[in-house]
From Swiss-Prot:
Gene of this entry: murC
Name the record gives this protein: UDP-N-acetylmuramate--L-alanine ligase
EC number(s) per entry: 6.3.2.8
Enzyme class, broadest EC rank: ligase
KW S-adenosyl-L-methionine (keyword) present: no
Keywords: ATP-binding, Cell cycle, Cell division, Cell shape, Cell wall biogenesis/degradation, Cytoplasm, Ligase, Nucleotide-binding, Peptidoglycan synthesis
Origin species: Lactobacillus acidophilus (strain ATCC 700396 / NCK56 / N2 / NCFM)
Amino acid sequence: MLDKNKQIWFIGIKGTGMASLALLLHDLGYNVAGSDIEKYTFTEVPLEKVGIDIKSFNPDNIKSNEEQVIVKGNAFKEDNPEVKACLDKGVKWQSYPDTVEEIVQMHTSIGISGTHGKTSTTSLLAHVLGEVAPTSYLIGDGRGKGVDDSRFFVYEADEYRRHFLAYHPDYQIMTNIDFDHPDYFKDQDDYTSAFQSAADQTKKALFVWGDDKRLQSLKTDIPKYTYGFKDTDDFQAVDIKKTTTGSSFNVLAHGKDLGRFEIHLFGDHSILNATAVIAVAYTEKVPMDAIREGLLTFKGAKRRFSEKDFGDIAVIDDYAHHPTEMRATIQAARQKFPDKKLVVVFQPHTFSRTKKYQKDFEEILRDVDKAYITPIYASAREANGDITSEDLVKNIPGSEVIDLDNIADLTKNKNSVIVFMGAGDIPKYEDAFEKLL
């Protein structure tokens, strides 16, 4: 249990979820510190900014349960020196999901789950609710904020290894169920069953995308509201206008017109995310004008269609690494930059996912003006595989394999929007390219 009289020690503090949680607890007045690998990660910047101490893994960091509450990252096993020290000393730990569940039970809680769109929707909902009431949040891009006496707690609920089954929220948004994590889930049915279990643990209402048949198949004893573009949806986005500055639309709530909303975001998926946010806020009786203002002032989530301009070249950084996400990002890029050449630099993420979706990746990348593919990003749990980036390139006419040593090839693309997409360390490719501009 969390205790302000003890140090909260994070084993693996630089993981995106762990970093978010550390920031949230620090904001709430807890004594937070932790350890991780020495290799630089972007999540350590906000931790260091607020003075959270980050050490290298060392068994001497582990004291006792009288002095510390140990929060262990999901990726760390008995071969980690601090996990081993806990076992040797009889020191108990709690998991990241179990710690988040403690916070879930303190507030009106809204979890955001789904294969795609979790981070964007969590960021947007936290921003909108934060305009009207104290709101704490945990976002999967390494951001977390704790506010004393929060009315709302908004958090990203990750389905990997069924971690989100530790949570029992008041509300839950489910954006979609699109098979992923083939290294853990056996098949689509196994994957869908995890979401059914998560739905079973939601207390007040479930908000689901109306076009997703698997979401429609979920059985619940609580209200299940749909959102989308169809007349049959409980919350329907209508009269949609798309421009190069964003999108605007009206929302009908059970047939009642809630008025006009505007977002400086792009693509159908952004309108769907906004409609889900409106649905939750409306259900919690948040004033419509406050929702409108929150949507209008939202500037986007980290690594979700993040833009930079370099003369006639626009650079977009996006986390997309699944075919559905890639299609959405490409659609958004075409909306924002209809007159530019569309160039994609794609980093395949894990060998198992690349093998599973090889044909989808090839089909998507054949439809852009120019595709570059970096070497496959291997995860800690899957160091190698029987597929390479070259296997994709040979099926995508005009595409090339790109690495840091030939990143200058990208400068040949004039009057272009260059989209760097991937969930691994693709920012290093973007950084190297930008130094050439």
